[in-house]
Amino acid sequence: EHNLGLAVDFNDVDYAFENEKAFTWLMENAEKYGFILRYPADKEKKTKIKYEPWHWRYVGPEYAKEMNDLGFCLEEYIEYLKNN
């Protein structure tokens, strides 16, 4: 994802980032700019990747909003699109 230019790490690999104001802002506003939290804590079984609060992925504002509204990670959203 980083090599494709679709992902950004907003902090060093540091779990304390989730306690910072920047993380709170991202959680509240990232979808407006088309970003999703790529590896949420409650989706580790689906993503097969440990929670990474610093790692965000660009999917576009429309898709980011829909994914957040549905409560889906990227893997779940792709599966949803394939079946609907």
Model-identified regions with their sequence ranges:
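Catalytic cores and adjacent binding grooves of peptidoglycan-active enzymes
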Residues: 1-84
